[in-house]
Amino acid sequence: MRKGRGLAMPEICRHLVRMDAQRKKPVLVVLSGAGISRESGLKTFRDSDGLWEGYNVMEVATPEAWAADPELVLEFYNKRRAQLDEVEPNAAHRALADLEDDFDVRIVTQNVDDLHERAGSTQVVHLHGQLRQVRAEDNPGVVESDILTVGGPEVPGPDIAIGDVDDRGVQLRPHVVWFGEAVPMMNKAAATVAQADAVLVVGTSMQVYPAAGLIDIAPSEVPVFMVNPDASAADGYRSRLDSFYALPASEGVPQWAAAIRLRLGH
């Protein structure tokens, strides 16, 4: 009989223990919005009634705007992308990343920045796309990942310009879901929430659909928490909320993280 080349028995046991521990980690689903990024210094449309540094949202963030003036749209998103290099993850982002030591943390974000990833979070679903990615204007399913981080043959720098194309010669556009467009990641987000053992809502009042419907997908026995400095953000959800933290994200999320560790035994 030939001796197997697999793991020795003690190693197999340790491997199975690790797999079992990983499988049993409670699933924490975080629904994050603009408020958590605002605390890092990023501008949001809500800061000034639909304006961003003087740009009207309807003139730069719709398919109609792209058709009418693509250069203006690219100028706007190039500026937003550049701002990412001026900010850092805050205490809320870091607290969520630290929870991965003890929990299966899955983030569903409405934000197009990369602050969750830069803080160390490894499972992030971007409902509305990502500023550092581009795609062909004719195909929402084709994404040139990270091309704006390192440059590439069609895009020599961090900005997109008219004439920057994919390998078929099709113009590139920001990989961002504009107002009026479908949300391709919605099904994945819904499946993520359905597996939650606890849900945290932070930096968003969850008033805009389709994202607003995600809370209703969480199993009824699953506790839902919210962190938001605006007490009215809980309106419409108070009967569903286990706890509400009327605090900025950078204060409330670390407090919630400590509480959830105690509650779920980690």
Predicted stretch roles:
Residues 2-266:
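Conserved catalytic core of sirtuin-type NAD+-dependent deacylases
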